[in-house]
């Protein structure tokens, strides 16, 4: 949501496919989980993960076609996730691109460059996030150019700090926006 707000402030048209009317941008350290999310804020979402992904991509592709017919050419699908690996597995933010898309690969590399610069400047350490293609459903099914962002490993304490501190969530959104505007 923070990235969406940032992009809107720069004039972008942004759609958040999975919405929750009572869970906006929050500054609590721990965000309560619930199950009242809706697709596009209105439509029930299937329980099955496969059906949820298909439903989400149908909306993404419908919106892409609508705006393509209006002459909008620069359209992206940004899929943001938090991984759940074994606790000892720490990871920096990493990016996937659609293997057949030069634009998707270029954008993922731009995002990685921004994160590498910021890690060196603010954390004084090398950035170990990667860029690679991966045949995930959302990457294969997306009509707009896709980028998949993996923010952290929720089971690793250091990674959790990256996403539970509100100021860190804003920093992540700021860096992602910077990468998209490059």
Label for each model-derived stretch:
Residues 36-46, 65, 99-103, 144-159:
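Short, Lys/Arg-enriched charge-dense amphipathic segments
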Residues 75-77, 92, 144-146:
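Extracellular structured ligand-interaction cores
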Residues 83-114:
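A short, glycine/acidic-enriched catalytic loop
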């Amino acid at each position: 949501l923070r990235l969406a707000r940032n992009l809107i402030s720069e004039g972008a048209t942004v759609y958040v496919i999975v919405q929750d009317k009572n869970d906006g941008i929050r500054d609590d350290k721990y965000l309560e989980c619930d199950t009242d999310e809706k697709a596009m804020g209105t439509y029930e979402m299937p329980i099955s993960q496969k059906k949820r992904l298909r439903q989400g991509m149908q909306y993404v592709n419908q919106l892409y076609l609508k705006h393509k017919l209006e002459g909008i050419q620069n359209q992206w699908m940004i899929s943001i996730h938090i991984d759940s690996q074994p606790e000892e597995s720490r990871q920096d933010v990493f990016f996937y691109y659609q293997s057949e898309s030069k634009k998707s690969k270029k954008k993922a590399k731009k995002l990685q460059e921004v994160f590498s610069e910021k890690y060196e400047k603010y954390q004084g350490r090398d950035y170990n996030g990667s860029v690679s293609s991966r045949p995930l459903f959302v990457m294969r099914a997306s009509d707009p150019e896709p980028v998949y962002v993996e923010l952290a490993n929720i089971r690793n304490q250091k990674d959790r700090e990256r996403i539970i501190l509100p100021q860190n969530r804003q920093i992540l959104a700021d860096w992602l926006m910077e990468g998209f505007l490059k």
